[in-house]
């Protein structure tokens, strides 16, 4: 069975962890951006039923309200 000869350094662990987290953050940002463009009607590449646009708009409205409340504290 293969066993590593030396212990992985803390800095290398941190680099790998941050890289992994960064990928997730980028994906979440893209998803939020896509949802926002769909809700405003600026999307040119997706056809979305009207009732789901209402849901997206409600989500964006709630998100904006939460951001406003968070900035006051």
From Swiss-Prot:
Cystine pairings recorded for this chain: none
Name listed for the protein in its UniProt record: Large ribosomal subunit protein bL32c
Presence of the UniProt keyword Isomerase in the record: no
Name of encoding gene: rpl32
Chloroplast in keyword set: yes
Organism annotation: Jasminum nudiflorum
Single biological process term from Gene Ontology: translation
Listed GO CC annotations: chloroplast; large ribosomal subunit
Keywords recorded for this protein, A-Z: Chloroplast, Plastid, Ribonucleoprotein, Ribosomal protein
InterPro entries listed in its UniProt record: Ribosomal_bL32, Ribosomal_bL32_plant/cyanobact, Ribosomal_zn-bd
Domain of life according to the entry: Eukaryota
Alphabetical list of Pfam families matching this protein: Ribosomal_L32p
Compartment(s) of residence: Plastid, Chloroplast
Alphabetical list of SUPFAM superfamilies matching this protein: Zn-binding ribosomal proteins (SSF57829)
Family: Belongs to the bacterial ribosomal protein bL32 family.
GO molecular-function terms, A-Z: structural constituent of ribosome
């Amino acid at each position: 069975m293969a066993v590593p000869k030396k212990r992985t350094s803390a800095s290398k662990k941190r680099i790998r962890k941050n890289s992994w987290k960064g990928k997730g953050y980028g994906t979440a940002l893209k998803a939020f951006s896509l949802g926002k463009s769909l809700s405003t009607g600026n999307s040119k590449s997706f056809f979305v039923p009207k009732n789901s646009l209402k849901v997206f708009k409600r989500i964006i409205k709630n998100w904006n309200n939460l951001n406003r409340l968070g900035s006051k504290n």
